[in-house]
Amino acid sequence: GRMADDTVVLTPPARLAQPVDGAIQRRFGEPIAGGGRANGLTFAAEPGARAVSPATGVVQYAGPVKGWGVILILRLAGGYHLVLAGLERTSVQVGQSVAEGQPVGWAPDGRQSAAEIYLEVREQGSPVDPMKWMRKRVG
């Protein structure tokens, strides 16, 4: 049983920084090609752009996942998890602590695959809409 999970008090992130400078191309809940709905946000990125961590956390996974490029999974302080996907490569390792805004990798150069970065936030394993925590970029 998973009864013990019910006693865990989760604290949502106070805010999330955009992983890359770029427009949001797909929002949470929007229909996606092939069926289903988006579980996160997709940002347009400049080819080869540096991607930064949207929040402070600890790297739980860093590596390639078929169809998603290189992904990062962070465990945030409040018990939430954050997934960053679509990276070309990362500059962090499992177990490493990262700060909000810290560079963690690079977007693709755009030749092989679109320079898009995907952001997903999970609450006890279920995707939730990151928009409510997105810090508005000034400018």
Model-derived regions: residue spans:
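Residue-level recognition of beta-strand microenvironments
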Residues: 27, 62-63, 87-90, 107-110
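Short strand-connecting beta-turns/loops that link adjacent beta-strands
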Residues: 67, 78-79, 112, 124
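Conserved, short, structured surface segments that act as functional micro-motifs
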Residues: 94-139
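Extracytoplasmic/periplasmic cell wall- or extracellular glycan-interacting regions that localize
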Residues: 1-69, 73-75, 127-139
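Active-site proximal loops enriched in glycine and acidic residues that flank catalytic Cys/His/Asp
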Residues: 55, 76, 86-88, 121-123
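Conserved beta-strand positions that form and line the central face of beta-propeller blades
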Residues: 42, 73, 83-86, 106
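Short histidine-centered loop motifs in beta-beta connectors
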Residues: 62, 77-97, 101
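Well-ordered beta-strand positions in beta-sheet-rich domains
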Residues: 40, 71, 81-83, 116-118
